[in-house]
Amino acid sequence: MNPAERLHNMKHIFTTNAGRASALPAILLLLALLLCAPCRAEETVTVCILDSGCNDNHTAGESFLEGSEALTDTVGHGTRICSLIREGAPEANVVMLKCFDGQDSVNEEPIVAALYAAVDVYHADVINLSWTLADESDALHEAVLYACSKGAVIVACAGNLSLSTGLGTIAYPAAWDEVIGVAGVDLNAQGEAETSLWYLYGKAVDFCARGDCGDEKGSSYSTARVTGLIAAALQNGVAAEQIYEYLAAAAQDMGEPGFDDRYGWGYLEIP
């Protein structure tokens, strides 16, 4: 069974047996990672980020924009994503594949090319997609399926602005079964997770995580936190096929008991 089928089936198993969710152990994933530290993976985990570039001179990668070879990030989005992932997985090999100059200029062609390169050239273990497309794309879906078949875990944001976009309307690629969809939450004064009208919630959401990053906020940053957590888990010996189950066991329930169609398995407490 290839990883894409495994992830699809894992989602199906969990969501159709949501009533059993209370039996899952309420593990603090970061503590579990510390306990797993002696059995580290031999190879460094590679995280590919498809985004707006990165202003860190130490970040490897390439640009898929026509006429531009530089990784320079003119909007700062990709740089913040890189930083959050590195905070969560400091030993990971982070690769930036620049696919757009601004969050409003996300085009399919460079993204599709970058997805294939992520697994064929850079051998990505995890791929971070902190952006959305409103319409489904066969070419992009094929690229996602291909990347999953090569063993990559793909993490994407559910999106923002639920009032203007429509409650429960999750954009692509998070809406595909093969992708782990992440929604954002805010933290209140007590450090507890709270939902916000700023974030999208719906059927394609698998997990929620805090969405703040300095003065910015969005499910893009929630996604980066989950990507960092996944990379750290892989680095500590968790198999890619077990990642979804591992995260589900660690999530703090939100909304209806167990898995639900708004918050998925719930909140992952990630710094």
Predicted regions and their residues:
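Bacterial N-terminal signal peptides
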Residues: P25-L35
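Active-site core segment of subtilase-fold serine proteases
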Residues: E42-V95, P110-A113, A117-Y122, N188, ...
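Extracellular S/T/G-rich loop segment that most often corresponds to the catalytic His/Ser-adjacent loop
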Residues: E43-D51, A171-V238, D261, Y267-I270
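Solvent-exposed loop/turn segments at secondary-structure junctions
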Residues: G53-D56, F100-D104, T132-E136, N160-S164, ...
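C-terminal subdomain of the subtilisin-like protease fold in secreted/lumenal serine endopeptidases
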Residues: D125-L129, K150, G181, Q235-P271
